[in-house]
Structure formats: C-alpha cells, structure tokens
C-alpha cells in the first residue's frame, strides 16, 4: 500500500515546485483520517481510488462484526431488488383498472339510458303515433278530396248531362229540381259502378270498343227521348185566355178557372236515364285511379267521394236551373214554356249528333 501511494505523494510534492505562485484546485488533498484522495481527473488518482474501494471490500480479521454487517448489507441488496415489483406488471394492473372503470362507466350510461327511455316512452310514443296517424289520415283525405273534385268536373263537363237534366228541371221549384238532379246522379253512379265491376270481372273478354260504340248510340237515343218528352210537356201547358171585355170580375174569374199545369213526375224513368248514361267506358276514370292508389283505404275514399261529388254536382246544377226558371216565371210570361222548348231542342239536336257523327268519321261524345 505504501509503495503504491508514494508516486502520488511524490507527484504532489513536485507539482508545487513547478507552480510556486498558483495553487491548483485540481490537486488531490490528503485526508489524515481515511488515507484516501478526493477524485481527480488524473489516471493515477483513478487507480488509487479503485484500490481503496477494493481494500474496503476485503474483510479484516480484526473487525468480524463489521464484516458481518457489510456481508449482510451486500446480501440483502439483491433481496431488496427482488422485492421490487416489475414495472410491466404495474402497467398491466393500471390498464386493467382503467378498463374496469370504462366498463363500469359504460354500464352506468346504458342503465341510465334505459331508465330514461322507460320514463320518456309514455311521453314520446303518443306524439309519434299521432304523427303517423296524421300522415295516414292526410293520405286518404287527399284521395277523398281528389275523388270529389273529379266527380264534380265529370258531371259539369259532360254536355249530355247538362242537356239531359235541363228539360227535367225547368218549371220546378228549387227543391224539386235538386231532387231530380240527385236521383239522376244516383242512377249515373249506379251505371258507372256496374260497368266498373264488369270491367274487373271480365277484363280481357270485355270489348271496350264495341261497348263504347253501342253505349254512345244509346246515350244519343236517350237524349232524343228526353227532348221529345220535354216538348210534349211544354205543349201541354194551357194558353192563357184573353178577355175581350174589360170587366175586372170576369178577368179574375177566368184566371181562377185556369187549370194548373201538370208537374213532371220524379220516378223510375229519371233514375233509368241516369243508369244508361253511366254505362259508358268513361266509368273507367273512377275505377283505374282507385286501383292505382297505394292503399285500399285511399282507393275506397276516392271511389266513394267521386260518386258523392257526382250526385252533389248534378243536384246543384238542377237546383240552379229550377231556381232561375222559377224566378223568371214571375216576371216574364210563358218563360217556362219557352225554356222547356229550347232545352228540349238542344237535347234532341245533341242526341242526333251523337248518333250520326260516327258515320261521318268523328264523334261528339
């Protein structure tokens, strides 16, 4: 030991002679108690420090207790290292704990959502069901209004309808004329329904062209018959007697003696005329749209309201004619007879035109 330490001491003794005026802080300082040097950057000091560390680790015979303590400390260090947990194991524990927390939080959210749905279902279900009902109701209501308007237009746009109803409603009161038009409209609807059912049952076996040809001829003949009956009724109206004398009492008695004109009867003939006019291929305009609608409810609503619109339109038309003729009767003498003659001649002319026009290559119906 002393030999190994002598070079370092000699080197330390030489260094002050080289630099007498400066004291270097890098020179090692000797400790009298431990005989060891502070760490320096020179290689000799590294060797001395390694030797001193090795000498401290060598057990001495004179200090058995210290050696035991040192051995125990060195032996106990690996045990302490073994007792330290593995960092990978700690990370796994942390991740498993976080996953459990996430699972618990997810389960809590699901439970809260289920409870909220159960609580809000009685509040949200009726409005949703009501909106669905509103949509369905609006669908069949739209179909119903469409059918009603189609029935009204079909009635008022047909010249045969107007020509056939005018002679029957002139000379009547407003309510009687409305009843005539409604009865004629019911017959027209019955004819359309019959033709629609025949079309659905027979389909390909039903020759539409043949039916249209003969139906057009029958409609023309019915118009001629209605016109002829109107002329007959107009000719039966008695002419007012002309008083030659200016006796007021005589004129009054003659007016009282005048027979009242016969009122036209509302019966089966009016209904049958409507049925004949309804047995036409134009009845398909109520069958085909009803079949093309998306639901049976919408189709039924269209069909029913078409028939109702036809009856209402015809009743309104005849009521208007009857009220006008009744109002003019009080102001213009013999206006009822004149209107009956005009309407009857129009019906006869239209009927003849419908019958004869196909022979000239065109059709008026």
From Swiss-Prot:
Loss of function: phenotype: Various vegetative defects, including reduced leaf size, dwarfism, and abnormal cell death. Plants lacking both CGF1 and CGF2 are impaired for female gametogenesis and embryogenesis, and have abnormal leaf morphology with yellow patches associated with an altered chloroplast integrity; this phenotype is rescued by sucrose treatment.
Keywords: Chloroplast, Membrane, Plastid, Transit peptide, Transmembrane, Transmembrane helix
GO cellular component: chloroplast; chloroplast membrane; plastid
Coiled coil regions, renumbered to chain: none
Subcellular localization, as worded in the UniProt entry: Plastid, Chloroplast membrane; Plastid membrane
Pfam families in the record: DsbD_2
Region described as Disordered: 1-30, 62-90
Composition-biased stretches (Low complexity): 7-24, 62-77
The organelle targeting sequence, given as a residue range: 1-79
Tissue distribution of the protein: Mostly expressed in leaves and flowers, to a lower extent, in stems, roots, floral bud, inflorescence and siliques, and, barely, in seedlings.
Domain of life per record: Eukaryota
Record field: transmembrane: 109-129, 139-159, 182-202, 218-238, 274-294, 301-321, 345-365
Keyword Ubl conjugation: no
UniProt-listed GO biological process terms: chloroplast organization; leaf development; plant ovule development
Membrane topology: Multi-pass membrane protein
Function according to Swiss-Prot or TrEMBL: Together with CGF2, essential protein which supports female gametogenesis and embryogenesis, probably by securing local energy supply.
Protein name, as recorded: Chloroplast protein FOR GROWTH AND FERTILITY 1
Organism: Arabidopsis thaliana
